[in-house]
């Protein structure tokens, strides 16, 4: 099978990484940002088309206020510190998620990241911020309902393609591979619509320990998968892989 065009990652385990080391959760989030930087560079070096990162869930607002403030501060720091480098490296930044109720300074930073890089032609870095897939789908349905109510849209013409065109990810191909770190085996309200035919890879290592070698191993695992897209015959055949490891940490198989 050919290499994935679009990889999406649920960056899980920052808090558990910190707890295992007797550190505050904030230290885990900071280590997670360092891993993020490294993987974005690695994805660009490998010629990946799209990398989507689940940075902040719409459910994360229920966390303790101090942790939320720390996460927002890290987002601001990442954009202010790294945006120039991303732009120099020809990375295009896209933000998905609900922005209407975000603080004005955060909205301004997100808009700046998109506007500065919108002509870049290298890696498409998609940051899911204040994102929840159910909310995304509800917003898309409401948009279609408004068009129906206004007489602009015949309900019988609504298709899967039209729904996709009204999602935050309009114009972005569905992920070929979704990776989740920290051993959890669920999507947690991430790209539910877009994941219809994605391959999944659940790794035991916590996100701060995820390295480019793990990304390379994910590529190799993907190459060994058989993707049928609802058909009978796979579009590419290879031997199935039973064990999935985090080679950088020699983690247990999942």
From Swiss-Prot:
Any one Gene Ontology cellular component term annotated for this protein: cytosol
Gene3D superfamilies reported for this sequence: Decaprenyl diphosphate synthase-like
Lineage: Bacteria, Pseudomonadati, Pseudomonadota, Alphaproteobacteria, Hyphomicrobiales
Keyword annotations from UniProtKB, A to Z: Magnesium, Metal-binding, Transferase
One GO molecular-function entry: magnesium ion binding
Active site feature: 12, 60
Entry keyword annotation includes Oxidoreductase: no
Protein name (Swiss-Prot/TrEMBL): Isoprenyl transferase
UniProt binding sites for Mg(2+): 12, 199
Catalytic class of the enzyme: transferase
Domain of life: Bacteria
UniProt-listed CDD domains: Cis_IPPS (cd00475)
InterPro entries attached to this UniProt entry: UPP_synth-like, UPP_synth-like_CS, UPP_synth-like_sf
One matching Pfam family: Prenyltransf
Subunit structure: Homodimer.
Binding site for substrate: 13-17, 25, 29, 57-59, 61, 63, 180, 186-188
Gene label: uppS
Cofactor(s) needed: Mg(2+)
Cofactor remark from the record: Binds 2 magnesium ions per subunit.
Summary of the function given for this chain in its UniProt record: Catalyzes the condensation of isopentenyl diphosphate (IPP) with allylic pyrophosphates generating different type of terpenoids.
Record bears the keyword NAD: no
SUPFAM superfamilies per record: Undecaprenyl diphosphate synthase
Any one of the GO BP annotations: polyprenol biosynthetic process
Family recorded in the similarity comment: Belongs to the UPP synthase family.
EC number(s) recorded for this UniProt protein: 2.5.1.-
